[in-house]
Structures are given as structure tokens and as C-alpha cells.
Regions:
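FAD-binding core/adjacent interface of flavoenzyme oxidoreductases
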Residues: 1-9, 66-151, 227-234, 245, ...
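A conserved FAD-binding loop/helix module that cradles the flavin
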Residues: 291-329
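Beta1-alpha1 glycine-rich phosphate/pyrophosphate-binding loop at the start
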Residues: 4-63, 148-191, 266-271
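A Rossmann-like FAD-binding core segment of flavoenzymes
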Residues: 67, 72-88, 94, 169-258
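Glycine- and aromatic-enriched mobile tails/lids
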Residues: 1, 317-367
Length: 367
């Protein structure tokens, strides 16, 4: 059995940030990721980040990912790809499938940064080829250079929906419309404005009624909904499309954490059932930490900061970082996080995180 001081499950922005922060202080770290390349969602993000320079504004996601990989390599972080963690057991033991063999490893501290999967919605024809998640479309276009379709209907107007719509147009596809059952656009205005300027219609208070086609998508019908989300008869509109992209939110991938016995709570504002954790990102199971979308759906910049906080906490708990230095550096990360949890969207997520912290402390009951 191989033993490590710290194991990171997931080589996305949260996992890499945690690994880098811990390794800076001397912690021995290995990162396992099921994919054949590290970086998580960053390498699909060809758009520029916005906000402050501190949060990598005006940099594209893939360039940020490359900088993380280079820094991790320089610090001696080991990255094991095509490696699936099958389970986390007592005392930090894990089973990992590395390519075609199963290995047993053990960690003094574990960081779970497994991210999230895409939500889907059922409707007549939803299993036809051509109905795909928006994230899958983004992977096809930005990672593999394959255009998902020629004519696309986007279901969902959150950040993922509007960003991927624009990227599909950059890839040469036509976006027939962006629809959403909500009455207002959910994505940031800076992203939605790019779509609006191209003339693509936003149909708010609309949902998809049916996908048409026999062996593939050949069209889609949408319908308006009322304030109670009920379809309004006679408001149907048909679009001739060959692809329907679904962008209706993400679901945190908490399977390993639930297997390990971590306390959870249901928090709709952050994506569903999540691991309760303290301000150091540590869960109810001592030695298991979380960061990124698995601990609540937020931005990539937030995932990075959470990863850094967890990395600092792990370095401190292993004796590599003294108390004053730990508190000072953690305070700096909290201050950086505060800027991301401002505004209407950010404040809501911040309050939801406070609830998870309260569940962890036992001052509130989990739903």
C-alpha cells in the first residue's frame, strides 16, 4: 500500500489549488483524476474571466489551467491521470483504479474536489441523439474540436447556457434561441449581452415541450409557462434544429463523501445535497476536506480560493505551517473570497455556505 501525506481526488481548479498550496509548505501530495488530462473545467473555458486581477480577470480558463499545472509540477506534486478513486474508507484508505489495475493507497489527509455533473430534464424525445448537456457540447468543441451540431436550441439561460451558446456560435453553429422557464435571464449580463447583440432571441418563461425526430433530433417545440410553471396551451413555437443543449444546473458529485460517512445537508442554492464543512473546508469526518463544486456550485475563482484554504489547513494540521502564519494566510484568502460573495448572486451563495458551516458546528439541523 502506497502512503501519502495528502491525496487530492480531482485535478480541477479546486484540487490543483489545494495541492499547490499544501506543497508550497512541504506537504507530499498526489492528485488522482479520472480523465486523461488534468485541469478540470478550466481547459474548456476559452472565454476571459472577469472581475479583479486577483481573481485572474482578463485571462482565459485554459491559460489559468496551464499555469496551475506548471506550478504543481515545479513543486513536485504527483498527478496520476486515468485514475478513478472507487472508495474512501477508514483512516484515509482508498481503492484507486489506475488504468486497468486496482491499487490501495492511504492518506493522512484527503481533499475531495470531484466537481459536479450536469442536470438533465426529461421530455418527449429527450433520449434522441442530439440532446446533450451544454457542458458536453463545450467539451466536444473546445477540447476535441468537434462541432456538436449545426443548429442549436439552448435550454437554460444561466452562465453555462449563455457562455456555451456564444462558444457554439464561435465554432460555426447557429443558435436558434435561448429559452428558460424562469422569467429573467439567470446568467451575468456581460455574457448574455454578447448573445443578444448577435440577434439570438431569449425566450423567458418558456420550456421545452418536445424533441422531434425518429433516429436523431430534427426539431424542437417550446411552450410558454405561467407564474406557476404550468404550460400555456396555444403558445407553442417550433424550431428546426439538430441539437438541443441542456443547461439547467449542476449536481455536486458527493458519492465518495457519502460513502465515507460525511454529514450532509440539502442546500438548493448551492446545487443540492452537500457535505457540511467548517471554515477550513474540513468535513465531519476528520481528515477529509472539500473544495469547489462538490462543496457547493459556485465560480471557478471560488473553487480556487476554497482549495487554497483547504491546502493551508492541511499543511497546518500536518505541522508544516505554524499557527500565526496559518491564520494570517487564511485571513487573506477569506478577504479574497468576500469579493466573490458580494452582489445578489454572491450573497445568496455566501449565506448558504454559512448554513453548511452551522450544520457542521451543530448549531443548525441538516435538512
Amino acid at each position: 500500500m502506497r502512503r501519502y501525506e495528502m491525496i487530492c481526488v480531482g485535478a480541477g481548479p479546486a484540487g490543483l489549488a489545494a495541492a499547490i498550496e499544501a506543497a508550497k509548505h512541504g506537504v507530499q501530495v498526489i492528485v488522482f483524476d479520472e480523465n486523461d488530462r488534468p485541469g478540470g473545467q478550466l481547459f474548456k473555458q476559452i472565454h476571459k474571466f472577469f472581475g479583479s486581477q486577483e481573481h485572474r480577470a482578463k485571462e482565459r480558463g485554459f491559460s489559468i489551467g496551464n499555469s496551475f499545472l506548471n506550478e504543481a509540477k515545479e513543486l513536485g506534486v504527483e498527478v496520476s491521470l486515468n485514475s478513478v478513486v472507487l472508495g474512501i474508507y477508514e483512516n484515509g484508505a482508498m481503492n484507486v483504479m489506475v488504468k486497468d489495475r486496482i491499487e490501495q493507497v492511504m492518506a493522512q489527509k484527503t481533499l475531495v474536489g470531484t466537481g459536479a455533473s450536469e442536470n438533465m430534464i426529461p421530455f418527449p424525445g429527450w433520449t434522441l441523439p442530439g440532446v446533450i448537456g451544454a457542458g458536453a457540447a463545450q467539451t466536444m468543441a473546445n477540447i476535441h474540436g468537434i462541432r456538436p451540431g449545426n443548429d442549436i436550441l439552448m435550454v437554460g439561460s444561466g452562465n453555462v447556457g449563455v457562455i456555451v451558446s456564444y462558444q457554439m456560435m464561435q465554432a460555426g453553429s447557429r443558435v436558434a434561441a435561448v429559452i428558460d422557464a424562469a422569467p429573467e435571464i439567470g446568467g451575468y449580463a456581460v455574457h448574455a449581452a454578447k448573445i443578444a447583440r448577435t440577434g439570438v432571441p431569449f425566450l423567458m418563461s418558456h420550456t421545452i415541450k418536445e424533441a422531434h425526430g425518429s433516429d436523431r433530433v430534427e426539431g424542437a417545440t417550446v411552450i410558454q409557462v405561467d407564474d406557476s410553471w404550468e404550460p400555456i396551451a396555444g403558445t407553442e413555437k417550433r424550431f428546426e434544429v439538430d441539437t438541443i443543449c441542456i443547461a439547467v444546473g449542476l449536481n455536486p458529485m458527493t458519492q465518495l463523501l457519502r460513502m465515507a460517512g460525511c454529514k450532509t445537508a440539502f442546500v438548493p442554492a448551492l446545487g443540492g445535497r452537500l457535505p457540511a464543512h467548517d471554515l477550513n473546508q474540513e468535513t465531519s469526518v476528520k481528515g477529509i476536506y472539500v473544495a469547489g463544486d462538490v462543496s457547493g456550485i459556485e465560480e471557478a475563482s471560488t473553487a480556487v480560493i476554497e482549495g487554497r484554504i483547504a491546502g493551508l489547513a492541511i499543511a497546518h494540521s500536518l505541522g508544516y505551517l505554524d499557527e500565526p502564519s496559518f491564520r494570517e494566510q487564511r485571513t487573506q484568502q477569506y478577504a479574497s473570497m468576500k469579493g466573490l460573495r458580494s452582489g445578489s448572486h454572491g450573497e445568496q451563495r455566501g449565506k448558504a455556505k454559512e448554513y453548511l458551516n452551522a450544520v457542521m458546528k451543530g448549531t443548525m439541523n441538516a435538512l
